[in-house]
């Protein structure tokens, strides 16, 4: 059984990887992925051995709060920005008290100058009050940090909590010594760390705020889509409008769409017309004109007219619901490249605590001065600096932040990745197999020429009258051509369809009811009276004389034209060093012509679904990484067999289950865009990981005091600043993907 739910209380990758590690050890858990950014988890488990309630209990034992739905954040007295501003103000106040006299004695009133026990004690008490206020503003670090420590799942908050608490306790001890007149020398008053506590917390809060703002911006793609989802719709019942919940709509319901409202579910216009904003599907800002018979998709916005539509999907299976599910899965899933960071994060925090304790002991023993309190202060500063400067967040954010921003960018291009692995793998593709009809071509064959043995208008009338009963795209091309030439429609009866061959019906022809047949050459008894040398899709029209003989009346030559810009986009793809193949069920002449015209390397014609499947198997056996690009309708086996499946779609014409990548702008440029975005994303992730590993590898030893003899020691305050800048740098570097652009050449 697969389930998705939310987890509250996670602060860094040590939290998410700790949950994964703990639950992953359970025999009944087959797979679990926890997303720190989305605060969510996807789990697959054996329902015969456990249930979701038991899994929730296991997570609660680790100190986190699992929930089936994401509860609204509790409204606090102070907003995050106000809390941050107050933290900055009180930090500056404490720094002013502790360091003002060093800059200039005139900055502080005489009563606060540390020239005697009384003023020293008063100054320290004011620092303590300021520090306690800042600690209260940053209390989440202590609540989450110590809770995680209690459950033996230490995280970034644990490091902050331990480090600042140690500094506070030491300062309180020094304050007690001053209060009890322990120091007899007026120049040997207590050494406090109240300003370090404040500065550390303030810098961490600034860093976290920048992170959260960046996360929120990156999550805007899903939020915007969810805002497009209407909660109610106007249903027509007995010529009356009734407002109903969208979840209650079933296929076949007639809905009224008012100007300015969003389409509730996928459907088809049955009365009226309108201009729809489909930018959430295609990324194109221009409105799309829709008339009777045209499909409309959930989440798109109607502009200035009202119309009636018939629902063709319920809410659960609508285009918008599928897109939201894809984005959620993409943001929640993990790329393979993140596994290394997860493994490091799982031991990172305990290792840092061990290093900090070891450094404290070593400095206490080998410190160069014989004064115990000097040695203790130095060891304590090193201990706090090591804890505070280490940055598991930089490691944890390196991959998911890039994935998050990349998915947001993809949605603006009309692209949707099924999961992070799809985004990661697209860059490795070295062979692309294209379906032809509807993928490289418009999928709407148009009549190129007509060969007729009877009056042309009569041939058009016969063919269109019969083809009107068919939903085949070729039939629609003939019907449209006849309609443009005002060919009259005839009454027909006894319609019979022979799948894969053609359609027949009784029609009034030359004053009698005759069986007229429309289809390919195999639908007729041998025809030798008309030779057609043109390349194209051949559709014959004939009269059945008897069961063994047909009379040829004429033939249509249709052509499915390539989409605009396809040739240029395939050239772009080939410039990446990727081999291209065309697989089509069309005849050899048409497929060969299409491949040569578009510059495709190889082709297979007359290909049945099994032939396409075999070709992809063959390519994979040769070590090729294969991307299959199709429309998702009749090539599902081939899509499933490929390494990366791309479905070119228009709304509900596609089932996202078959796709790794869905392009709703129905443009081959999307394939090139997906590959380039994948390359840019992985490059960005590698930059983030490189920085995160280098930062921790360099700054943790530095905080330990390895350069003490060079007079380089990091204070806890500087360590806090460095840690904040580390995670912020990863976030800002990930944001560069927002500026990703596809070059035309």
Curated annotation (Swiss-Prot):
Record-listed Mg(2+) binding positions: 631, 635
GO cellular component, one term: plasma membrane
Keyword Cell inner membrane set for record: no
Main location: membrane
GO terms of molecular function: ATP binding; ATP hydrolysis activity; copper ion binding; P-type divalent copper transporter activity
Catalytic residues in the record: 435 (4-aspartylphosphate intermediate)
Keywords (A to Z) from UniProt: ATP-binding, Cell membrane, Copper, Copper transport, Ion transport, Magnesium, Membrane, Metal-binding, Nucleotide-binding, Phosphoprotein, Translocase, Transmembrane, Transmembrane helix, Transport
EC number: 7.2.2.9
Name the record gives this protein: Copper-transporting ATPase
Organism: Helicobacter pylori (strain J99 / ATCC 700824) (Campylobacter pylori J99)
Name of the coding gene: copA
């Amino acid at each position: 059984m697969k389930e998705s739910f939310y987890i509250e209380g996670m602060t860094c990758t040590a939290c998410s990887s700790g949950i994964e590690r703990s639950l992953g050890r359970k025999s009944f858990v087959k797979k679990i992925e926890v997303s720190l950014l989305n605060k969510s988890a996807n789990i697959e488990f054996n329902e015969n051995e456990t249930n979701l309630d038991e899994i929730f209990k296991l997570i609660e034992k680790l100190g986190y709060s699992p929930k089936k739905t994401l509860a609204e954040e509790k409204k606090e007295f102070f907003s995050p920005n106000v809390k941050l501003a107050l933290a900055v103000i009180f930090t500056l106040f404490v720094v002013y008290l502790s360091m003002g006299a060093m800059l200039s004695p005139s900055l502080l009133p005489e009563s606060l100058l540390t020239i005697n026990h009384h003023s020293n004690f008063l100054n320290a008490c004011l620092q303590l009050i300021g520090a306690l206020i800042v600690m209260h503003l940053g209390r989440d670090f202590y609540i989450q940090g110590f809770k995680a420590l209690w459950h033996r799942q230490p995280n970034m908050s644990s490091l902050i909590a331990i480090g600042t608490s140690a500094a506070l306790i030491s300062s309180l001890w020094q304050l007690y010594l001053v209060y009890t007149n322990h120091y007899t020398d007026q120049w040997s008053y207590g050494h406090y760390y109240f300003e370090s506590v404040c500065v550390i917390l303030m810098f961490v809060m600034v860093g976290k705020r920048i992170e959260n703002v960046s996360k929120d911006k990156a999550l805007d793609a899903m939020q915007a889509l969810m805002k497009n989802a209407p909660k109610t719709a106007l249903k027509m019942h007995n010529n009356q409008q009734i407002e109903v919940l969208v979840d209650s709509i079933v296929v076949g319901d007639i809905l009224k769409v008012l100007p300015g409202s969003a389409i509730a579910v996928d459907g088809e216009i049955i009365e009226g017309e309108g201009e729809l904003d489909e930018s959430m599907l295609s990324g194109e800002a221009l409105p799309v004109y829709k008339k009777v018979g045209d499909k409309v998709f959930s989440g798109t916005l109607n502009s200035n007219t009202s119309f009636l539509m018939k629902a063709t999907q319920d809410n659960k299976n609508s285009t918008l619901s599928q897109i939201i599910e894809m984005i959620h899965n993409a943001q929640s899933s993990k790329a393979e490249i993140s596994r290394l960071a997860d493994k490091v994060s799982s031991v990172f925090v305990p290792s840092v605590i061990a290093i900090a304790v070891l450094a404290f002991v070593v400095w206490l023993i080998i410190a160069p001065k014989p004064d115990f309190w000097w040695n203790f202060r130095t060891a304590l500063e090193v201990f706090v600096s090591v804890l505070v400067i280490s940055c598991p967040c930089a490691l944890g954010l390196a991959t998911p932040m890039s994935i998050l921003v990349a998915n947001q960018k993809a949605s603006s291009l009309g692209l949707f990745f099924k999961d992070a692995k799809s985004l990661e793998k697209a860059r490795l593709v070295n062979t692309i197999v294209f379906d032809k009809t509807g993928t490289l071509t418009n999928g709407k064959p148009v009549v190129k020429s007509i060969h007729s043995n009877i009056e042309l208008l009569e041939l058009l009338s016969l063919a269109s009258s019969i083809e009107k009963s068919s939903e085949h795209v070729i039939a629609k091309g003939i019907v449209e051509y006849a309609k443009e030439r005002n060919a009259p429609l005839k009454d027909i009866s006894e319609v019979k369809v022979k799948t894969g061959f053609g359609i027949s019906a009784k029609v009034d022809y030359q004053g009698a009811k005759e069986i007229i047949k429309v289809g390919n050459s195999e639908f007729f008894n041998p025809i030798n009276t008309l030779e057609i040398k043109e390349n194209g899709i051949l559709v014959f029209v004939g009269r059945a004389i008897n069961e063994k003989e047909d009379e040829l009346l004429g033939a249509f030559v249709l052509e499915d034209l390539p989409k605009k810009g396809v040739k240029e986009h395939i050239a772009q793809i080939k410039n990446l060093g990727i081999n291209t193949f065309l697989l089509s069920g069309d005849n050899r002449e048409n497929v060969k012509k299409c491949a040569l015209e578009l510059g495709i390397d190889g082709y297979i014609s007359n290909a049945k679904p099994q032939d396409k499947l075999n070709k992809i198997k063959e390519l994979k056996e040769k070590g090729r990484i294969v991307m299959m690009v199709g429309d998702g309708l009749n090539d599902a086996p081939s899509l499933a067999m490929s390494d990366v499946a791309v479905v070119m779609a228009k709304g509900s014409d596609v089932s996202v289950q078959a796709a790794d990548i869905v392009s709703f702008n129905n443009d081959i440029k999307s394939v090139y865009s997906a590959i380039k975005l994948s390359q840019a994303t992985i490059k960005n992730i590698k930059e983030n990981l490189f920085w995160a590993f280098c930062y921790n590898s360099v700054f943790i030893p530095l905080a330990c005091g390895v350069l003490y003899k060079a007079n380089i020691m990091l204070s806890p305050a500087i360590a806090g600043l460095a840690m904040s800048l580390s995670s912020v740098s990863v976030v800002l570097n990930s944001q560069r993907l927002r500026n990703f652009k596809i070059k035309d050449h």
